[in-house]
């Protein structure tokens, strides 16, 4: 959270030197990044489906109408997970959550250096709301933004978007 690269060292926990030390002065200079990480951590806590204790089965074993976890591409419910794949959508069905929060969570990844469009699965009476767009100047939305289209999302290059599916807010 404080831009501590550890000079690429993934095992800095065992080093008592500047590689492993955290420079807390960076926190003042990067308050926006720290606020973003705090918001994402709070989002994850609020959506227990993202940290399920049960392994995902990729099937609708509780007959909620959706599998617990599904992958999506340019077409909903269809994706090729192949070598050249540059974008991917993952739908976590909130009905499988062991909490009161039953919101669906869709995480969309665009690894490509150009705009990529991913299909959004139809949610029946629910609508899609954008919560995070990593390519925006302010990536985390304090209030989820209703999507103009519930059919697809056009993602900026090399970005991650997080959407929630919930009943329409009026």
Where are these regions (language model features)?
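Carbohydrate-interacting/catalytic domains
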Residues: 2-170
């Amino acid at each position: 959270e404080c831009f501590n690269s550890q000079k690429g060292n993934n095992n800095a926990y065992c080093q008592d030197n500047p590689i492993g030390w955290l420079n807390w002065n960076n926190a003042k200079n990067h308050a926006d990044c720290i606020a973003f990480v705090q918001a994402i951590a709070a989002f994850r806590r609020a959506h227990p489906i993202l940290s399920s204790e049960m392994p995902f089965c990729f099937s609708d074993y509780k007959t909620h109408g959706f599998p617990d976890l599904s992958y999506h591409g340019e077409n909903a419910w269809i994706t090729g997970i192949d070598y050249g794949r540059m974008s991917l959508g993952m739908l976590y069905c909130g009905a499988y959550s062991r909490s009161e929060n039953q919101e669906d969570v869709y995480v969309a990844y665009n690894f490509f250096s150009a705009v990529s469009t991913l299909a959004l699965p139809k949610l029946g009476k629910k609508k899609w709301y954008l919560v995070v767009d990593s390519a925006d100047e302010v990536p985390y939305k304090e209030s989820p933004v209703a999507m103009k289209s519930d059919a697809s999302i056009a993602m900026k290059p090399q970005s991650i978007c997080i959407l929630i599916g919930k009943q329409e807010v009026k």
